[in-house]
C-alpha cells in the first residue's frame, strides 16, 4: 500500500482550502482648506469665494470671512487631498484673475 500525503484525497488529486480575506480599506486622509488674511482683498470678494467654491450660505461665508479678518486665518472646509487641492487652486486662480493677493492653503487635518 502506498503512503498518503497530507492533502491527497487518495485519487492522486490534491485539495487545498482557500480562505478569502477581506481587504481593509482605510478612510482617506482629510485636509483643511485655509484662507489667509491680507490687507488688500475686499471682504466682499472673500464672501464671494466662500459662496462660490465652498457652497457656503451668505451668513456662513460672512462669519468665516470675519474670522479670517480678525484672526488672520480661517477654515473654509475639510476635504480629501484631491478635492482640497482643487479648491485651493480654484481660489488662488480666481483671486489672481481679479488681481487680489488672497492666499489659500491646505494642511492635514
UniProtKB/Swiss-Prot annotation:
<dbReference type="GO" id="GO:0006508">
    <property type="term" value="P:proteolysis"/>
</dbReference>
<dbReference type="InterPro" id="IPR022935">
    <property type="entry name" value="ClpS"/>
</dbReference>
<dbReference type="InterPro" id="IPR014719">
    <property type="entry name" value="Ribosomal_bL12_C/ClpS-like"/>
</dbReference>
<protein>
    <recommendedName>
        <fullName>ATP-dependent Clp protease adapter protein ClpS</fullName>
    </recommendedName>
</protein>
<feature type="region of interest" description="Disordered">
    <location>
        <begin position="1"/>
        <end position="25"/>
    </location>
</feature>
<dbReference type="Pfam" id="PF02617">
    <property type="entry name" value="ClpS"/>
</dbReference>
<dbReference type="GO" id="GO:0030163">
    <property type="term" value="P:protein catabolic process"/>
</dbReference>
<comment type="subunit">
    <text>Binds to the N-terminal domain of the chaperone ClpA.</text>
</comment>
<comment type="similarity">
    <text>Belongs to the ClpS family.</text>
</comment>
<comment type="function">
    <text>Involved in the modulation of the specificity of the ClpAP-mediated ATP-dependent protein degradation.</text>
</comment>
<dbReference type="InterPro" id="IPR003769">
    <property type="entry name" value="ClpS_core"/>
</dbReference>
Amino acid at each position: 500500500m502506498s503512503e498518503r500525503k497530507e492533502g491527497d484525497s487518495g485519487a492522486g488529486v490534491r485539495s487545498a482550502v482557500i480562505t478569502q480575506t477581506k481587504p481593509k480599506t482605510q478612510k482617506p486622509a482629510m485636509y483643511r482648506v485655509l484662507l489667509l488674511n491680507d490687507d488688500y482683498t475686499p471682504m466682499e470678494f472673500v464672501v464671494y469665494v466662500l459662496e462660490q467654491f465652498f457652497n457656503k450660505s451668505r451668513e456662513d461665508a460672512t462669519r468665516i470671512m470675519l474670522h479670517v479678518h480678525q484672526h488672520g486665518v480661517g477654515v473654509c472646509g475639510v476635504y480629501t487631498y484631491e478635492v482640497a487641492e482643487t479648491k485651493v487652486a480654484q481660489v488662488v486662480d480666481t483671486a489672481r484673475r481679479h488681481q487680489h493677493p488672497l492666499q489659500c492653503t491646505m494642511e492635514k487635518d
